[in-house]
UniProtKB/Swiss-Prot annotation:
Binding site for sn-glycerol 3-phosphate: T12, R82, E83, Y134, D246
Functional pathway: Polyol metabolism; glycerol degradation via glycerol kinase pathway; sn-glycerol 3-phosphate from glycerol: step 1/1
InterPro entries: ATPase_NBD, Carb_kinase_FGGY, Carb_kinase_FGGY_CS, FGGY_C, FGGY_N, Glycerol_kin
Protein's gene: glpK
Regulation: Inhibited by fructose 1,6-bisphosphate (FBP).
Organism expressing this protein natively: Renibacterium salmoninarum (strain ATCC 33209 / DSM 20767 / JCM 11484 / NBRC 15589 / NCIMB 2235)
Protein name, per record: Glycerol kinase
Binding site for ATP: T12, T13, S14, T268, G312, Q316, G413
GO terms classed as biological process: glycerol catabolic process; glycerol metabolic process; glycerol-3-phosphate metabolic process
Record's function text: Key enzyme in the regulation of glycerol uptake and metabolism. Catalyzes the phosphorylation of glycerol to yield sn-glycerol 3-phosphate.
Residue sites binding ADP per the record: T12, R16, T268, G312, G413, N417
Annotated signal peptide: none
Record's keyword terms, sorted: ATP-binding, Glycerol metabolism, Kinase, Nucleotide-binding, Transferase
């Protein structure tokens, strides 16, 4: 009997393959980073072919490290950076343009055009999302409008669209030789095109965007057998049986299956998801309404989400662009060497402000600078920015739900940073809890795939795998917490109203 499940985690900065055992423990991993392409200010792209090649390679790495073969693997699960759009030729398998990444802001003029007459909430009742550069829909329209011949080829039925889950699945299951063109409900809910109530593509919205329905993948549940692997000999005939967008996957991996449970993932961006059960809840406080998960024919679970565009990528910017640090862990050392931020606040609105503001006219700002400030203060302010943004999202969740969260489960790469987690607890005023397995995104995809093939029997079995690793209790006085929040909110206002006709 196969004793393991493999998860493919196609993320913003890298592609990984992680093998899990029945207890949810990591057996082995493979990881490769891909190039971040910045052709112009506000533009962010990935090479989709590089992503697929890396995916094949990391599968081999993970299997060889554990000395396993395809016969040991019960199923493949896939999780992915959501909203990142790939358009490719179904006959050649070649992308017609680079993947346009979720952080990319080039489509603001398309957003403005579509908002005429109905505002940015024109489609929100159906899809749960405001018009924004963040989601896939405007990216597809941009490719059709700007790549020579793309619109004509799409109209002829020659082009396919997918977020990177669809791109990886299509290639994994055969590509041009019968690859399965599908997506799951969680990824579909991030396109601007799926009706949350019917879980189907909305033709009226597609017509408004000018996107042919023939390009779109078939919408499936998050946990069912979609097909089997054909293009990788290493996993040949292994069922591909689970797909979840990365933030929904992390929620699933945290075993937040029930109404009122939540998690916050600290990665390139920061994403808090609050499970609303089988009810579609429309936020009045700047949150997104999205699909949480759907297991086979079981009822759909929905969620509220607070999306923060920049978290770990702010640390990358300090390292790779400014050269202020040599490695990400160095930030914790620098931040710990000073008692406070020296009066400095960094608002990392590189792609505008996401939740709860949704201000596309905002841009990054560093405020409160004096000659006293050194790079240690900057490092501390960079970490604190993530915690402050999370506090604002949590306030919105509490306002929408009417039941304040009493603790916050966390995961993602940044949760290894003890200083950040302590400050997060301090600024939230509630305990912050890290699980033993922090690779919850990949684990969630593995769980979805394993459930579909009977590797795990039910959600109760998955819940028993979850275990607490560390807990941070708030230690900040309430008066100081309130003062810090007032200063943060003041700093946020300084980032707004920047983009106008003079800014290119």
């Amino acid at each position: 009997m196969s004793q393991y499940v493999i998860a493919i985690d196609q993320g913003t900065t890298s592609s990984r393959a992680i093998i899990f055992d029945h207890d949810g423990n990591i057996v082995s991993t493979g990881q490769l980073e891909h190039e971040q392409i910045f052709p112009k200010a506000g533009w962010v792209e990935h090479n989709a072919t590089e992503i697929w090649n890396n995916t094949r390679e990391v599968i081999g790495t993970a299997l060889s490290k554990a000395n396993l073969t395809r016969h040991d693997i019960a199923a493949v699960g896939i999780t992915n950076q959501r909203e990142t759009a790939v358009v490719w030729d179904k006959t050649t398998g070649e992308p017609v343009y680079n993947a346009i990444v979720w952080q990319d802001t080039r489509t603001q003029s398309i957003v403005d055009e579509l908002a005429v007459g109905g505002g940015v909430e024109r489609f929100k009742d159906k899809v749960g999302l405001p018009l924004a550069t963040y989601f896939s829909g405007t990216k597809i329209k941009w490719i059709l409008d700007n790549v020579d011949g793309a619109r004509e080829r799409a109209a002829a039925g020659d082009l396919l669209f997918g977020n990177t889950d669809s791109w990886v699945t299509w290639n994994l299951t055969g590509g041009v030789d019968g690859g399965v063109h599908i997506t799951d409900v969680t990824n579909a809910s991030r396109t601007m095109f799926m009706d949350l109530a019917t879980l189907s593509w909305d033709q009226e919205i597609l017509d408004a965007f000018g996107v042919p329905a023939s390009m779109l993948p078939t919408i499936k549940s998050s946990s069912e057998v979609y097909g089997t692997v054909h293009t990788s000999q290493l996993l040949r005939e292994v069922p591909v049986a689970g797909i979840l967008g990365d933030q929904q996957a992390a929620t699933f991996g945290q075993a937040a299956f029930n109404t009122g449970e939540a998690k916050n993932t600290y990665g390139t961006g920061c994403f808090l998801i609050f499970n609303t059960g089988e009810e579609i809840v429309h936020s009045k406080n700047g949150l997104l309404t999205t699909v949480g998960y759907k297991l086979g024919d079981a009822p759909t679970h929905y969620a509220l989400e607070g999306s923060i565009a920049v978290a770990g990528s702010l640390i990358q910017w300090l390292r790779d662009t400014l050269g202020m640090i040599s490695s990400a862990p160095e930030v914790e050392e620098l931040a710990a060497s000073v008692e406070d931020n020296g009066g400095v606040y960094i608002v990392p609105a590189f792609s505008g402000l996401f939740a709860p503001y949704w201000r596309s006219d905002a841009r990054g700002a560093i405020v409160g600078m004096t000659r006293y400030v050194n790079r240690n203060h900057i490092a501390r302010a960079a970490l604190e920015a993530t915690a402050f943004q999370t506090r604002e999202v949590l306030d919105a969740v509490n306002a929408d739900s009417g039941v304040p969260l009493t603790e916050l489960k966390v995961d993602g790469g940044m949760v290894a940073n003890d200083a950040l987690m302590q400050f997060q607890a301090d600024i939230l005023g509630v305990p912050v809890i890290r699980p033993k397995v922090t690779e919850t995104t990949a684990l969630g995809a593995a769980y979805a795939a394993g459930l579909a093939v009977g590797f795990w029997n039910d959600l109760g079995e998955l819940s028993s795998n979850w275990a607490e690793d560390k807990r941070w209790e708030p230690a900040m006085e309430e008066d100081e917490r309130a003062r810090q929040l007032r200063l943060w909110k003041k700093a946020v206002t300084k980032s707004m109203d920047w983009v106008d006709e003079d800014v290119r």
